[in-house]
């Protein structure tokens, strides 16, 4: 069993049209729009599709899976082969994809990235976290890092099952013990890192060594050696 993560920025050169036509959904072809936000989100979806294609190749799996993506009632994309799971996240101009391959058991993964920006962190923490976690947050020197750690890990575990941010407060986070508990995700482990241009949290439903990280750089994936991360046990 192996886990792969690729991330990239839509301002880097990339060509989805380099893929075989049958692997490109109609809704991912180029669009014309006057809305910069609509264009940005569309480009993020296009890059995510390309990153998933590249990860399938690296993993030695058939890229034909790209034409066999289904969606749950909540809209979460998945493959019919339960031993292979993937998840996508984007924030601003950044995109990340996680792909997990298991030999026999069912795979479940979730990923969340956030491009940092200043927010009312205290108000958001009061909305999603209990008093003990808020106290921990207020004692951290780097409030930006602390907030996105609390936020990203919640989203990542919930996205493994297709739950949205409405359940964020149902995730119990113990930062000192590096443990996470939730009724809305299976047992597993999670990594959080602030080493990249984005904050990133990734969940897998099994015990796994650090995923293989790749960065999209000038039309190809390049290996990224991650050195700084926090490992959590989940449930």
From Swiss-Prot:
EC annotation from Swiss-Prot or TrEMBL: 2.7.8.-
Residue positions binding Mg(2+): 112, 114, 155
A Pfam short name: ACPS
Any single GO BP term: lysine biosynthetic process via aminoadipic acid
Signal sequence, start to end: none
UniProt keyword list: Magnesium, Metal-binding, Transferase
InterPro entries (alphabetical): 4-PPantetheinyl_Trfase_dom, 4-PPantetheinyl_Trfase_dom_sf, P-Pant_transferase_sf
Cofactors required: Mg(2+)
Gene Ontology molecular function, alphabetical: holo-[acyl-carrier-protein] synthase activity; magnesium ion binding
Gene Ontology CC terms: cytosol
PANTHER family: L-AMINOADIPATE-SEMIALDEHYDE DEHYDROGENASE-PHOSPHOPANTETHEINYL TRANSFERASE, PHOSPHOPANTETHEINE TRANSFERASE
Family indicated by similarity: Belongs to the P-Pant transferase superfamily. Gsp/Sfp/HetI/AcpT family.
Its biological purpose: May transfer the 4'-phosphopantetheine moiety from coenzyme A (CoA) to a serine residue of a carrier protein domain.
Protein name per its UniProtKB record: Putative 4'-phosphopantetheinyl transferase HI_0152
Species name: Haemophilus influenzae (strain ATCC 51907 / DSM 11121 / KW20 / Rd)
């Amino acid at each position: 069993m192996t886990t792969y993560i690729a991330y990239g920025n839509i301002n880097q050169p990339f060509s989805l049209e380099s893929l075989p036509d049958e692997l490109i959904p109609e809704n991912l072809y180029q669009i014309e729009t006057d809305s910069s936000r609509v264009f940005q989100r569309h480009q993020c979806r296009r890059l995510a599709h390309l990153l998933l294609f590249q990860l399938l190749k690296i993993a030695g799996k058939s890229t034909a899976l790209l034409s066999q993506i289904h969606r749950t009632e909540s809209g979460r994309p998945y493959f019919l082969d339960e031993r292979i799971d993937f998840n996508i996240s984007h924030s601003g101009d950044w995109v990340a994809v996680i792909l997990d391959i298991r030999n026999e058991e069912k795979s479940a993964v979730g990923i969340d990235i956030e491009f940092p920006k200043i927010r009312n962190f205290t108000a958001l923490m009061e909305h999603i976290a209990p008093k003990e976690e808020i106290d921990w947050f207020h004692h951290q020197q780097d409030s930006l890092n602390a907030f996105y750690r609390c936020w990203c890990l919640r989203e990542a575990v919930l996205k493994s099952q297709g739950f949205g941010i409405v359940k964020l407060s149902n995730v119990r986070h113990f930062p000192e013990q590096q443990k996470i508990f939730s009724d809305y995700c299976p047992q597993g482990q999670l990594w959080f890192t602030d080493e990249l241009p984005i904050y990133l949290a990734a969940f897998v439903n099994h015990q796994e060594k650090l995923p293989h990280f790749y960065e999209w750089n000038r039309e190809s994936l390049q290996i990224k050696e991650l050195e700084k991360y926090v490992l959590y046990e989940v449930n």
